[in-house]
Amino acid sequence: MVTTSVRPASRPLNFWACLGIPAVAAIILVLLELTSLDMDLARLFYDPVAGQFIGRHSYLLEDILHDRAKQVVIGFSVFAILGFTGAFFIDRLKPFKRELGCLVLSLALATSFVTPMKAVTAVQCPWSLEQFGGHETYSELLSPRPATDKPGRCWPGGHAATGFTLFALFFALRDRRPRLARQAFVFAFALGTVFSVSRMMQGAHFFSHNVWTAIFCWMICLGAYYYILYRPGSEVEAAGKAEAVGA
């Protein structure tokens, strides 16, 4: 890893891909509200005989892939905070202060947005709906919520965000270690997908809930990278000339 005090120029950023793909995905998700895809996928994991989702009380899904996995990601976040703090005092970490700061900020924002959005949107979980043994009435994302004394707290997906928030690692590594950054992207996407499917099997979320979560996490991490780390080659060249003049 390069350890110079001057950060390297950022690799070219394809804004059409970074912004366009999430935008198209969001439009598709809105259009999917006109279909029964979410319900159809949820029914694949629902056992009408038992009257519950097949993974509702699964030790693997609840204790391992939910509780323990979340603790691991929290531990990683704490480690990132310690690294960022250490970058103010430890010489070996000082060149990476901005990367570590971007990582910490991205992790914080990509997880903290979930709870307030759940409260505002009040979307019900599949396991709470009449179609799956519950007592609540289904409503599309952009439709008014039926009157209830138990508002939903299921959009976007909190556990999916635990995985997709690691997009932050991709951006933190993007300029210095591009190959490792690509591996981090694949890992974050795979982990978020596994967490998403596991919660769908438990009846905690619909498919669209988790895709929305991936979009939000990506956009948050991209925004943090752009404002904190992104430096086109022209800016780096100008900084180098300024240092040369100062010397």
Model feature map: region roles:
Residues 15-16, 21, 138-247:
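Membrane-embedded catalytic cores of phosphoryl/pyrophosphoryl-handling enzymes
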Residues 71-91, 159-175:
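Transmembrane alpha-helical segments in integral membrane proteins
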Residues 22-26, 76, 103-112, 214, ...:
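Alpha-helical transmembrane spans of integral membrane proteins, capturing the lipid-embedded, hydrophobic core
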Residues 84-120, 181, 185:
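Interfacial segments of alpha-helical transmembrane regions
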Residues 27-30, 110-115, 190-200:
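Aromatic-anchored segments of alpha-helical transmembrane domains
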Residues 37, 89-96, 119-127, 204, ...:
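Transmembrane helix-loop junctions in multipass membrane proteins, especially transporters and channels
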Residues 2-80, 118-126, 135-136, 246:
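N-terminal transmembrane-helix/juxtamembrane module of multi-pass inner/ER membrane proteins
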Residues 31, 78-85, 113, 117, ...:
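Alpha-helical membrane-inserting segments
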